[in-house]
């Protein structure tokens, strides 16, 4: 008799995705981040659901409702901090996942890569709107500054901003709609994840060598299920350490002050995971130019498949490209640092140089380096 997991219509899908899936025998721990992102999304949806049961999206009571969750709801504090720090873990995994894709040339699976870029944009939008909900000072002013950027769009900009606000400033209508979108987007993300996996399973996974591995596959279960479980344990340990010992390490103290439209905080800055993009935005003196650079800092990932000039897929055997890759990583860390600094000398010029280097590396230096490597290998 055939096993039910191979015949049942629903279990068959699970079986082909998680159990009998042929996987390369040599994928390293860098391939763990996909499943870790799935875990993060699950944690965020569950904790978010419980928070939504007690949260009120009204300007008068939003801040108080978050305080009420932390003080009066059973284990409300741990749910709130798991959700807030879970977002940080989510972005750490996202950045490592994308970095892995760049290093090992996974972007040559263009459909999977493009859905991944959509997922990145959707996650960033969700995180931004979630940051507005506690209605602290940084929530309010962050929402004001970022939504205001759309006014840089010629002709329709001002109308567009007022349409998003639902009025002439960030107010009750804005908070209510942000809550609605923040609630629905994770489910859209979950649907996109399914599409992401659908396209990935059409081609099979890449591997560190970048060489086709069809002749050497192993079943996903038990080999990679056990490997993913180790990743889960490490991620949960790190998250719980953050939540239980340093819950406010990655937050902003300004957000413990209720939103006040009459008092602007001295340094308006987003959560740490947006600082690199914020630094790129601030490095251009022109408003529209800054907004374009901000969008392009992520959208530039979409041109990577077209800029792949190397005859090899992975960077595993390309030391020159590896060097440029790690310079890019260092550059992004520099941008993250600059994004959190005030707009004054020397931070302005460092930010401008780092922003210029970011685009230069991706658009020119890395493709040129690949061509040089081809020449050196006489390919």
Swiss-Prot record:
It is a multi-pass membrane protein. Its cofactor is heme b. It comes from the Eukaryota. The keyword Protease does not apply. Heme b b562 binds at residues 83, 182. One of its GO terms (biological process) is mitochondrial electron transport, ubiquinol to cytochrome c. Keywords: Electron transport, Heme, Iron, Membrane, Metal-binding, Mitochondrion, Mitochondrion inner membrane, Respiratory chain, Transmembrane, Transmembrane helix, Transport, Ubiquinone. The keyword Transmembrane helix applies. Heme b b566 binds at residues 97, 196. Gene3D superfamilies: Cytochrome Bc1 Complex, Chain C. Signal peptide: none annotated. GO terms for molecular function: metal ion binding; ubiquinol-cytochrome-c reductase activity. Binds 2 heme b groups non-covalently. Component of the ubiquinol-cytochrome c reductase complex (complex III or cytochrome b-c1 complex) that is part of the mitochondrial respiratory chain. The b-c1 complex mediates electron transfer from ubiquinol to cytochrome c. Contributes to the generation of a proton gradient across the mitochondrial membrane that is then used for ATP synthesis. The cytochrome bc1 complex contains 11 subunits: 3 respiratory subunits (MT-CYB, CYC1 and UQCRFS1), 2 core proteins (UQCRC1 and UQCRC2) and 6 low-molecular weight proteins (UQCRH/QCR6, UQCRB/QCR7, UQCRQ/QCR8, UQCR10/QCR9, UQCR11/QCR10 and a cleavage product of UQCRFS1). This cytochrome bc1 complex then forms a dimer. Belongs to the cytochrome b family. This is Cytochrome b. It comes from Ochotona erythrotis.
